[in-house]
């Protein structure tokens, strides 16, 4: 139905767009005369290459096109010039050599505008002083190592309750994917808001709906110059409706925090405890943010923390468990390591997680094969430049296919094989300097929440491996991906836990 609606709109707009297409073709011809655009597949009138991106996962389709046209491609998605990078060398050009030229996000994606409270968040705000101030706040106060460590007791408590709940269902087939997702949301909710409340379940539901709605294709994004398309876009109104409900809950949470802001903070182990909303409101009160930090900005940042932090962590834990079920030798090796390190304690806490070198390799390998956001987030070229002799037009959307790069046979031995051992002696890390490995992006807009995400991945995985052996009632797991900005498995993971005899969660 959606496809026919798309064709209907394309037909109605044919005459109007054809004149613009002809004009733009004339403008683009200057590149063929003087500068050469990167290679790419043939285009058709109006749609450009948009029709080639239907019928499958976009990151798969782009990888296959790159095999034919090269690691630096030019596509036309409607009227939008789009550059696709599919190799470490091209990624380095974007994230390092020309980093500042690719530091912007597209400013004409309506869905981004709505959920980011008019581009006022950390993720999609325009590159400039405001973004630098937000980045400073996130790196120094919200998501710093010190801040993440301050939530250690929350993580340990939530994960232990999670383990007890699973232990009570021994021998019963459980939806582990759902349990993991609820756990990560629970940790993030307490870190952000201080406690779970009556709105938590509804908040999670709306956030999930928003994330899925943003990922849906919107014809208006293909023709940003045709403003009236937004007026007839069902996608826009769907996102706005969900976002208004989401905003009501966040507004209520902010109001509650403001009412208690002058009250003494809770005490734990002799230390004052602030949640992330407290931190943001304190910055707002101090007024030391160069640009005004209003409630709208705070709400946008809250959306970032949940949409990015929870999805990345829960998706990675889920994929890691799936891969270990498929590869029992890996599972056994990871279990032996964590049980050896924490044998005396009888339970896993964060004190010795750094000793779990093999588990860290499992996480790295999971992120190589299954980066949560396989195409990262799009960037926009701020001014015309050259990459490998090709012209990159100003205002082009730029996509880096991190999924394809992580499976590049020129850089990875047996790239389709799940083999954590490859990382045991490797210096490749998450920091964006290893361009063959970019699960969190790179350059100055690399994900600021890496530390927060990893903390929510390591402890749950270690506990699941320590306390239980796992049985799958399915001969062959479905490893197909779902659709969306964040790529989960198509099916939830159902497993049967068997309590490990030496474990005794207190």
Curated annotation (Swiss-Prot):
Keywords tagged on the record: Alkaloid metabolism, Endoplasmic reticulum, Heme, Iron, Membrane, Metal-binding, Monooxygenase, Oxidoreductase, Transmembrane, Transmembrane helix
Name this polypeptide is given: Tabersonine 16-hydroxylase 1
Enzyme Commission code(s) on record: 1.14.14.103
pH-dependent activity: Optimum pH is 7.5 in phosphate buffer and 8.0 in TRIS-HCl.
One Pfam family recorded for the sequence: p450
The family this protein is said to belong to: Belongs to the cytochrome P450 family.
A GO biological-process term: alkaloid metabolic process
Phylogenetic lineage: Eukaryota, Viridiplantae, Streptophyta, Embryophyta, Tracheophyta
Protein origin, superkingdom: Eukaryota
Subcellular location: Endoplasmic reticulum membrane
Function: Involved in the flower biosynthesis of vindoline, a precursor of vinblastine and vincristine. Hydroxylates specifically tabersonine, 2,3-dihydrotabersonine and 2,3-dihydro-3-hydroxytabersonine, but has no activity with naringenin, tryptamine, secologanin, strictosidine, ajmalicine, vindoline and catharanthine.
Residues annotated as transmembrane: 1-21
